[in-house]
Amino acid sequence: PRSSSAASDVYKRQGYKNATWWESRFWLGSYDDKFDINDLGYLRRNDMTWSGMMFKIRRLEPIGYLLGSSFEIKLNKKWGIDDILIEDELSIETWTLLKNYWRFGLNSFIKRPAYNDEDIFRDDNAWVYETEKFWYNGFWIKSDRRRKLILSIDAGMGNAELRGKGYYSEFEIDYKPIDPLNLSLEFKRDISPNYMQYVDIIEDGSEIVRVYANSKQTTDQIQLRLDWTFSPDLTFQG
């Protein structure tokens, strides 16, 4: 922890990792309203408290068709100004490695109703509003990484009652014709609906009208990447 007469921040983390099959962690952190966010080297709001816990079960010894597997559950909570709950998320992640070195996994999370206070930093007359419950379920699969040609797929769907459904999909091809050279081609599509996005505040005489709107962000991306290692000290990327 670090503190001074002007501002203070606290961060604690405690955990245990069993060498064979399980591990757990707990963390708690806080910034007061005088904490200088520039002290961290990047933009992060102050006057915030967060905590969470994680529990993971893993198997690293081969059995049957499996070389290894893992199951992790995690809980995150954040509180903002006046101890308002601004994040309440529960997530689950799994992965499995097969004997043919293909691997696959599942990831799922649910954001339970909390509050969003980000708009009051833009305008003092904006609202702190209640967020809706949102869930996301996804899966991924990746072929043998020892091969010259590696295929991977990542996809998922999220949903909330008011904002509706969103989708994510990604397909990637990695090709390694020779050891120093790696080529990668990635196709990605992301459809993300947003709810209660702040627009503006209109003053009409003595009346204040707060304008919010739904929106939907669609991202289509194709990316080609090249990595060529000439020596341990010289690499070309493009």
Segments (PLM) and residue ranges:
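Single conserved hydrophobic/aromatic residue that forms the stacking wall/gate
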Residues: 1-7, 11
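Flexible, solvent-exposed coil segments and beta strand-coil junctions
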Residues: 30-37, 69-75, 116-121, 147-153, ...
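Residues that define the transmembrane beta-barrel architecture of outer-membrane proteins
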Residues: 9, 47-51, 86-90, 133-137, ...
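Repeated loop/turn-to-beta-strand initiation elements of outer-membrane beta-barrel proteins
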Residues: 20-26, 62-66, 100-106, 147-153, ...
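Extracellular loop and loop/strand-boundary signature of outer-membrane beta-barrel proteins
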Residues: 38-43, 78-79, 123-127, 156-159, ...
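Transmembrane beta-strands of outer-membrane beta-barrel pores
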Residues: 28-34, 57-59, 73-81, 108-114, ...
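Outer-membrane beta-barrel translocator domains and adjoining extracellular loop/strand segments
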Residues: 8, 36-42, 82-88, 116-125, ...
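Residues on the lipid-exposed face of transmembrane beta-strands in outer-membrane beta-barrel proteins
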Residues: 13-17, 53-57, 92-96, 139-143, ...
